[in-house]
C-alpha cells in the first residue's frame, strides 16, 4: 500500500553523483615510467582498483532531471583513465536512503582510450598506444595469475577479482569502437 512501480530507462554510461577529477595543476606530461602509487600497475592510466562507490554522492537535482526525461536507474562511473575501475548501479528515488538506492556497488568495469586527468605520465600518447597498454595490461594479468610475479600488484588483483563483471568501453566514435572490439576479441573481453 502506498508503493508505486514506474517503468523507466536505465542509463548504463553516466557519471551521476561522481565528480570527474581535475587535471593536475603545474607541469605537463613527463617521461615518468614508474607508477606514482607503490604496489600498483606501472602505468597510472590503469585505474582498475578504483571503485565508483568511493566517490559517489547522490545528487537530488541531477536525479530529478534524469527522472523527468524517463530514467529511473543509472550506472555511474568516474570518467578518468584508460581502465577506469568499477561503476555503481543506482536507483533514482529521492525518498529512499542510499542503502535502498544502491542496487549494485560493483556493476561493471569501464574503459576508454583517454588518459587519466590525475597523472602526468606521457605514455600512451596516441590511441594506438592506449590500445597497446590495454593489451599489455591483460597479458601482464595472465602472467600474474600464473604465479610469476614476486610482488603484489593491487591494480592487477582488482582486475582479476572483477573479471566476471560486464565491460563497458567509452570509444567516442565508430573507428574507436571497432578498435575496442578488436582488443576485446584478442584479449577475450566482451565490451
Which ranges hold each PLM region?
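Phosphate/adenylate-binding glycine loop and adjacent helical scaffold
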Residues: 58
